[in-house]
Amino acid sequence: MKNMIYNLISISLYSLIIILTDIYAKTSSLICNKNDIYLNDKFYFLKKKKYILYDVNIGEGFNLQKEVLYRMSLVIYQLNKRDKEYIYYLVLPPWCYLSHWSNKRHDNLQWNIFLNMNIIKNVIPIIEFSDYKKLYGDVTDFIISFKYLLDSNAQKAKYYHVLPFDKCYIEDYKFKIVCKNCDYKYSVTYSGNCTNIKGKNTLCYSDYIVTNYLVNYVVHKLFYIHNINSILIKNSNVVLVPFPNELFENNIEDILLFNEKLIYNGNNYIKEILKNSNYISCHLRYNDFKKITSYDVPSVQIAILKLLYIMFMNNKEKIFISTDEKKYVQYIINKHFKQFKHFFYFYENKDNYHEGQVAIIEQWICANSSTFVGNIFSRFTMHIIWERYLITKGKEHQNIDLCGYSINNNEQLKNRYKKIQYIYDHSSIEKLNNIYNTYSEIDKKYIITLCFGFPSHFPSNLSIYRKKYIPFA
């Protein structure tokens, strides 16, 4: 009788596995697989789950948080590659407070309103914090953080140091001991003041360099030694940025694709308003950058003149601008460049998208232009160029930097660029209707100065996930 029951259970379980495998095969066939570590194991959903939560400094911008997601994805990918006993999930922190958003308070926005989550799930196991909270609450087994050893003997140290958690200072993390005799003794704020997370244990790890390999080793050891289910990594933006080839070799460099609806909105703008991809685009950042003297951003008036020069030089007829000072930029164009204002285009948020979604739409429009002009100090710019490299728009002449205003007499600023060119194009100057001649000699030289960044910082492969979305491809 027992054998009969056992056989029935075995047959039922086997049938369930076949059905679930078939369901997965049908749903995932719409997405190109890339030899994934966990999905290749047909029994992965039967493994015991482990969870890694993380966050960044309070208020950090959207694009930095995207970078950190790349770093943490690499940690998860490597954990699942090395450990066949458990399945490791990355818990995505909600969006509540960002210093760059005009509306700084939000109620736990999820990642799926910004990114295509199916693509990420195709490579690493993920779960939104709201779903984790339903299962386990606002708690975790360990709260840990990492910091850099800054003393002169740091590089001589053979092993990392393990310290009390409060030695990993994190601004506004509100670490406190909530009780002494309960399971979850400790509390920290989580993900832009979304909530507080309680933990059973806390630790700080320090080393002269904090790589994804160190994080991988530390969390794997904690999971096994303490037989725990979850770890929160506070301030995970201290983890070193991986090289693009590391991300490529681990199938991660192109998994952060924008939400499909936002891509379609951007493509509709390109097709209906710009008519084709034969336009230049630009990111002008002023709000906080004009206060940072080392960034040396040019005035809006000079920036607009330079954009016109670049447009004429490249034989284009449209300039799309993404900027945090939209009204002021439009005011300058209307006041000083009235005869050229028909060349300039700005995205209008007619569908009442969240401002973070608008930024993504504008990034996509910029990514698909024939030439992009950005700011080397801006992560917003960097992520546009990252997208451009993933859709074969990574050639040197296709990505230009606006240059700091003092580029021609500032050696420190010059060293930030791979190449600087001085191109006087007579026909382009003529098209500017003598406006060029009203500027000072310093301004004139700045206008014809073109700066180029380092391509080694970006991927070099066409993204299989983006191919079908490229307009006019």
Swiss-Prot record:
CDD domains found in the cross-reference section: O-FucT-2
Cellular-component GO terms for this entry: endoplasmic reticulum
UniProt source species: Plasmodium berghei (strain Anka)
Keyword check for Membrane: no
GO molecular function ontology, one term from the record: peptide-O-fucosyltransferase activity
EC assignment: 2.4.1.221
Signal sequence extent: 1-25
Gene: POFUT2
Name this polypeptide is given: GDP-fucose protein O-fucosyltransferase 2
